[in-house]
């Protein structure tokens, strides 16, 4: 299964993910850059850590399986930035098939309303993996997937941008999530997110010299990437791991990290068939 360890790198928190005793995510730093304020990147001290275990079985309204088991070990790291007297927590959940983590901001007088300039969550790869990716684009996901080594993304990205009316490719090494990866040892990785609510969608930008992915959030018209009011939290960042590619697709990790259904009565929710009129318009009824 999956394991995770946390370390303090000169006041900056880093995490590592192992699978069956072998690293699949090398030590990767975490933090957020704020607009017009001291960033939540470093200068932290660990105030408290706590662990817990959770195990439940729940039923989705509709889905591939009737019952879904939500079983994880949790680590909550409570941080203080003494120079600003601000507090931030990072919550990690470790499943058999991967991990999820998110930033949490408790209610506090020195961090109430704040604007995120960029989130700097890193995912350090352990090698030049094979990747299945589409270009990082704020406006469309309608691309064919490209299979290549991580080191080849830069050279292939422009050729992977198909003709489309709305395109904003943000970086020569930017890709969208979810991204699927395969190591030389046959271990599969998937990087994505869960519980995306009132926050920007996460893309990934690759440092192709060091083979490190870093989160890259979709901006608004002013270039801001998140408007926050504590107490609040970010979406979960997810890493699914397996030596069987089919298990990546079968994983319930993201479903388990999504927020529970808020409707008391779900009897009115029914699956339906949908005919896409948009495709009828642009394809002219061609098969």
Which residues fall in each region the model found?
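Conserved catalytic cores of very large enzyme subunits
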Residues: 265
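Substrate-binding cleft of carbohydrate-active enzyme catalytic domains
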Residues: 268-287
């Amino acid at each position: 299964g999956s394991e995770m360890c946390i370390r303090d790198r000169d006041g900056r928190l880093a995490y590592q993910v192992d699978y069956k005793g072998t690293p699949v995510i090398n030590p990767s730093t975490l933090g957020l850059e704020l607009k017009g304020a001291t960033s939540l990147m470093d200068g932290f001290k660990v105030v408290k850590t706590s662990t817990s275990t959770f195990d439940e079985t729940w039923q989705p309204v509709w889905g591939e399986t009737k019952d879904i088991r939500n079983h994880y070990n949790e680590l909550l790291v409570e941080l203080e930035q003494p120079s600003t007297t601000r507090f931030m927590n990072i919550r990690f959940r470790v499943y058999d098939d991967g991990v999820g983590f998110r930033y949490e901001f408790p209610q506090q007088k020195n961090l109430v309303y704040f604007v995120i300039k960029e989130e700097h969550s890193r995912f350090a790869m352990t090698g030049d993996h094979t990747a299945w990716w589409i270009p990082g684009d704020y406006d469309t996901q309608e691309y064919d997937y490209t299979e290549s080594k991580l080191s080849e993304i830069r050279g292939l990205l422009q050729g992977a941008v198909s003709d489309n009316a709305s395109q904003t490719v943000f970086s020569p090494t930017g890709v969208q999530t979810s991204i699927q990866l395969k190591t030389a040892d046959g271990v599969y990785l998937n990087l994505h997110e869960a519980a995306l609510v009132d926050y920007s969608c996460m893309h990934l930008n690759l440092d192709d010299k060091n083979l490190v992915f870093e989160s890259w959030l979709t901006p608004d018209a002013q270039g801001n990437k998140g408007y926050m009011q504590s107490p609040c939290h970010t979406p979960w960042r997810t890493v699914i791991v397996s030596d069987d590619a089919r298990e990546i697709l079968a994983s319930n990790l993201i479903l388990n990290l999504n927020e529970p259904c808020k409707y008391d009565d779900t009897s009115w929710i029914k699956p339906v068939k949908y005919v896409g009129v948009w495709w009828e318009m642009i394809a002219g009824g061609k098969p």
